[in-house]
């Protein structure tokens, strides 16, 4: 970051990249030589001017972090190895300068009543190191704080610092200067300064089918029409006869209303919700000052919002903004066709898949997708009783960019990216040794909050495996993999599931991070209650059946917590704790095999293959070729030190 010259990369301890680069003929400019130069790396030759610049960079950085008495030096060793130079940089930080006194100078006196009450959240404290990086962060924090309260034109350049170090003892008297808004320059070239303006929203125009190419035409606006809906002007072209998205849907995703005080959080929320619909390719939220309201001195009573005391009422200048939201839609419809062929020593196979997607099927950014698949296999084995295998399936999904609920959810301000998804799938397999049908139906909701959490709830989650026929003698009894053998059992699972994920990796990208996952599912309770009321077990059986299948009744929960602690720029200590428990009851004696816990694999103990670690619930036979260790409970912990290996060679 600060050193201007770094050694060449090495491969297995050798200067491989320099060697490749030097194989290129400098007098020939053909593709082969260009390829060598691109793959290789030019040798890094010692440049003392860059070495001096590196020392200056180190000194500037230490000054920037408050170590003004620091020193940076270097030594060059050219004798240890022939034609090689070794540079050693040394830094001495010494005692840092600290903040002795902090004061404020408000050139815009109205901002004093807003900023001073919020100093409890200030990043600047007396006694702390005079770190200019923290000073910049405080400027950004105040700017964001004011932009949340109507100060649209306020920037970090409106805040300056004056530092006085003449008092000695490595102490700094710091003054923050909050300036007025620079409105322009007069005829003599002097700046025109005014108090910062609080802006309200005037008109809100949304273009749900914006075409940037057509918008540059001189007569573009003549062909536009507008529908007004609850403070929102939905602008569309007359040739389309109506907007491509219903105004009521657009109103739900735009949390900006006329006469609202400008708030940058609502602007970000508007952009995120538009893009999360999945229908628009890009979007722009543009604000323009209304000249008629800005030009005149329009003084109104403004009550500071947020953390200010209730009596902080003052007179400030007010302006208005026109909001234009330009939404460029993606391709509405699409399809795919896939053909796949396969061959082994046992069979020939051919599979075809046709899929269709509509991203706006009901003019509300609803996404509908459906796919059909057909497969055929021909067995090469002449002794097989049946040499043909057929498989076909249908999968459908319908997703709404909102909650489908019998009550309104507009008041839930913390909910972001709400989704409702309906899914249906069925797959029929007719093979020489078995015949089965796999089907699933699900109704689920998903959403996230304003920070790091995401949620998923499936109140309806049904999965059915119906084994119509299986040849035990010639097929099932010969399977040595117990996990594979149990996959050919019929099962009926009807329940609900919930999952929660907390992940602050996006906020602390490259730094410390925490990842928490919680999953819970419960099956069979509602169905079991209905069966007890209206039915009874079949003769000779102590359990209930639905469509001739025993339904599962159980609950299952698991929790995983991971923590990453950076020990340097590329080295990290990562710890993980996992716990899970499941229990069958009522109509079941065991949890479905694919819901049991196991250890090993990429998401568990990576040193072991999946389902091969741990005793599980039932010990495996000693002669088992494919051990399958499954259980009703799992506790797991691991600790990893992650560091790059490539750079070590």
Functional labels for PLM-detected ranges:
Residues 67-72, 152-156, 348-352, 392-394, ...:
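Amphipathic hydrophobic-ligand
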Residues 89-95, 106-108, 176-182, 208, ...:
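Flexible glycine-/small-residue-rich
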Residues 342-345, 456-648:
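C-terminal outer-membrane beta-barrel translocator/porin domains of Gram-negative envelope proteins
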Residues 111-114, 243-244, 260-517, 532, ...:
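Gram-negative/organellar outer-membrane beta-barrel architecture
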Residues 85-87, 172-174, 321-323, 352, ...:
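Hydrophobic residues positioned within well-ordered beta-strands of beta-sheet architectures
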Residues 1-276, 285, 320:
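Interaction-mediating elements
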Residues 132, 236, 240, 257-260, ...:
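Hydrophobic alpha-helical scaffolding
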